Design a protein with these regions (language model features):
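N-terminal auxiliary segments of SAM/dcSAM-dependent transferases
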Residues: 2-123
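A short, charged helix-loop
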Residues: 127-133
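Surface-exposed loop/turn positions
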Residues: 110-112, 160, 258
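S-adenosylmethionine
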Residues: 155, 189-280
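Conserved SAM/SAH cofactor-binding pocket of Class I
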Residues: 135-218, 227
Length: 280
């Protein structure tokens, strides 16, 4: 079994109407992607911004007649005219195997590797983090995660205490523990991230007591109970907006002689983030 793929170029004002039209004609899936490499960062709460130029792709069963579908779509969209439509046949394949083949071991710095569980570790004597793509952000493929991992690989983390604020999959915390840290505390506002962090910790034969993870409210409660003390190093690979907003709060979690590693920042946001943390 294969699929018929329909693709067209559109704009933000037309996209919702065309989506509805395709859904009415029994599309199986619809995807919108950026047609011009235009970044959209940190939308306001409740907003779902789209790019100025969009490529819309829809999948249909391979039993449809593309010519009939085009005719019906144009008829239902009349008197307006649809953008040019392109069709192609997608052959069926082992999608899970294809996905696995595209996720290979990655090296960060001199000694650190991220390896999927189905792959052979290229350097068994190196520090290998076993990690599969899953519920939460963080596999090493994102540039900001890669930067953080490479930086961690260069540090002396022996017996240090860390906080990973926005821990996602737990990748940075696990790397720190395998590089010698004594304890990492993970914080994330997504319950699935906490589940993923715990699972990945166990997959790497690490004791969960050395990587406790909390939702932000529970983390604050632990601080108020004085169960959490200022740490040697705080990692925060999130976004510039939250980093600036939380500057005083995050800085207070670090010892006076400690360090803060901030990432997830665009080049033109760096100065604003630096200014927010300058008092500390």
């Amino acid at each position: 079994m294969g699929w018929i793929q329909l693709q067209l170029s559109t704009t933000p004002d037309l996209a919702p109407e065309i989506e509805s039209l395709l859904e009415a004609h029994h599309s199986l899936a619809i995807t919108l992607v950026d047609a011009a490499d235009q970044p959209v960062f940190e939308p306001a709460r409740g907003e779902t911004p789209l790019w100025d130029s969009i490529i819309l792709t829809a999948l249909f069963p391979n039993t449809i007649n593309p010519e009939e579908l085009i005719q019906n779509l144009n008829q239902d969209y009349h008197p307006k005219k649809l953008p040019p439509l392109e069709f192609r046949l997608l052959e069926d394949e082992d999608w899970e195997r294809t996905w696995m083949d595209n996720f290979k071991p990655m090296r960060f710095g001199e000694n650190l590797w991220i390896c999927p569980s189905w792959a052979t570790t290229p350097e068994p004597e190196a520090i290998n983090i076993m990690l599969d793509p899953g519920l939460a952000f963080g596999t090493g493929t994102h540039p900001t995660t890669a930067l953080c991992l490479s930086w961690l690989d260069r540090q002396n983390l022996k017996d240090k205490h860390l906080i990973d604020y926005g821990c996602g999959s737990g990748i940075l915390g696990i790397a720190a523990l395998l590089l010698g840290a004594r304890q990492v505390i993970g914080v994330d506002n997504d319950p699935q991230a906490l589940t993923a962090s715990r699972s990945n910790c166990e997959k790497n034969q690490l004791d969960l007591k050395n990587f406790p993870v909390y939702l932000p409210k529970e983390f604050v409660r632990q601080i108020n109970l004085k169960a959490i003390q200022p740490v040697d190093l705080l990692l925060a690979n999130i976004l510039a907006g939250p980093l600036i907003e939380l500057a005083a709060y995050l800085a207070a979690l670090v010892r006076s002689d400690g360090e803060i590693l901030l990432s997830g920042i665009l080049e033109d946001q760096a100065e604003s983030v630096q200014e927010a943390y300058a008092p500390w």
